[in-house]
From Swiss-Prot:
Gene: guaA
Xref: Pfam families: GATase (PF00117), GMP_synt_C (PF00958), NAD_synthase (PF02540)
One term of GO molecular function: GMP synthase activity
Record PROSITE patterns: GATASE_TYPE_1 (PS51273), GMPS_ATP_PPASE (PS51553)
Family matches, as SUPFAM superfamilies: Adenine nucleotide alpha hydrolases-like, Class I glutamine amidotransferase-like, GMP synthetase C-terminal dimerisation domain
Catalysed transformations (reactions): XMP + L-glutamine + ATP + H2O = GMP + L-glutamate + AMP + diphosphate + 2 H(+)
GO CC terms of this entry: cytosol
Pathway(s) this gene product operates in, as recorded in its UniProt entry: Purine metabolism; GMP biosynthesis; GMP from XMP (L-Gln route): step 1/1
Domain of life: Bacteria
Glutamine amidotransferase type-1 domain sequence ranges: 5-196
Upper taxonomic lineage: Bacteria, Bacillati, Mycoplasmatota, Mollicutes, Entomoplasmatales
Keywords: ATP-binding, Glutamine amidotransferase, GMP biosynthesis, Ligase, Nucleotide-binding, Purine biosynthesis
Span of domain GMPS ATP-PPase: 197-388
Catalytic residues identified in the record: 83, 170, 172
Protein name: GMP synthase [glutamine-hydrolyzing]
Amino acid sequence: MKNTQILILDFGSQYTQLLARRVREANIYTEVLPFDTSIEKIKEYPLLKGIILSGGPSSVYLQNAYKIDSEILNLDIAILGVCYGMQLLTQYFQGAVELADEQEFGKAIITIDDKKNPLFKNVTTESQVWMSHADHVTELPVDFKQIAHSNASIAAIAHNTKPIYGIQFHAEVTHSLQGKEMLENFLYDIAKCNKDWNLDDFIDQQIKEIKETVKDKQVILGLSGGVDSSVAAAIIGKAIGKQLTCIFVDTGLLRKNETIEVMKAYETNFDINIKLVEASDLFFSELKGIKEPEAKRKIIGKCFIDVFTDAARQHKDADFLAQGTIYPDVIESSSHGASSKTIKSHHNVGGLPEDLKFRLIEPLRNLFKDEVRQVGFKLGLPEEMINRHPFPGPGLGIRVIEEVTKDKVEILQEADAIFIKKLREWNLYNTVSQAFVTLLPVKTVGVMGDNRTYDYVVALRSVNTIDFMTATSTHLPWEFLDEVVNEIINKVDNVNRVVYDVTSKPPGTIEWE
């Protein structure tokens, strides 16, 4: 790779991916690696300009605290410790970190003590930041100075002679109002990175590599209808055309008319081979009687792999398997040791039998979701395909709460289609990050005409988010919601009540299951 590089060592912060995206947004290539990555591995990056130590949930003074290879600190590169990362630097350089009497969580104001420090170029003397720490630095490390403080703690430190910095706050979070400036100061002025990461070069490089790797062989790819697999198909198809065969599995758990729409979209926009596999009966049979969300996810994942495997075996001439894996999948599926606990299982990364012996092609594995969308636009994919809201791998199987049946899915499909249609009619669809309907496992009493009803409840959900790591509910117009509710009640059989979910993430997740 010809680009200058920044590495992020991950100690399990919920903001690590956001931190990586901020670096990418600065047109600098970055990768996230486990906190215990060896010095030998790090030296494999020839144009490495700096390392960022992420935040994390642990405490540096605990016996089993997460550590880095101390040789990293002897490299002739810039280093920035964020939150836990700053405390780790403090400990390595013989300072002191203790549990704070006055802990800081949320918005805080820091005061810059060293206005001439390059980290704070074009930053005001007082600046709002986002704090999330129970521990604090009580004694400066040797050869370091304090360059910023808050009411409760040392907020930033800098080495006297080396380009090593620590910040106690999360500059990557938008609540840190000048965090972008601080990060860019570190990247451009301290680490001396070039703005040389761009997606046009990425596309050209991927097409070249795919051609050189595949040559005259065949490739198969599992299509979901989502953005990731669509863009993966587009970039591979641009490289090798009809040598790519896409397999689309109809699980029965897709949105209303999705199978028809997806097949039409691919046939219209791609010069590739597409095969449809109808497997809904299998999925409904395997899900019968299953209520627990994680069990449903695993069953759906296994069924998909079994169906895809059977279809793949029919393509005996295929040497390569392509996947729409993106960088968050890679980060979350890697063993970081320090990483946050698994919240929900991912079923779409790996899992195919070893005897298939495919070689893997993952052209998007180094891109974040927003970058994938940009690549899709650059490749000429239609806007409605690229800007489609995210859809979970298990599909409506996790939007029907508890047991999934064909009848329940049909109810949900109708209600969801009305909600999405209305969002488009009101020109709201592209103003929200994700919107959908969930079918609840409860019935309520209602009145329809002169008759008593006892039918299901559906919940509308619409959120806005930058990165899907945190999200807030959308403040949709009351008149809009009233119109949606009326149409669902009047047109969807077996539903007599509609609620609107206003829970943020956290404490909730975006999906109900």
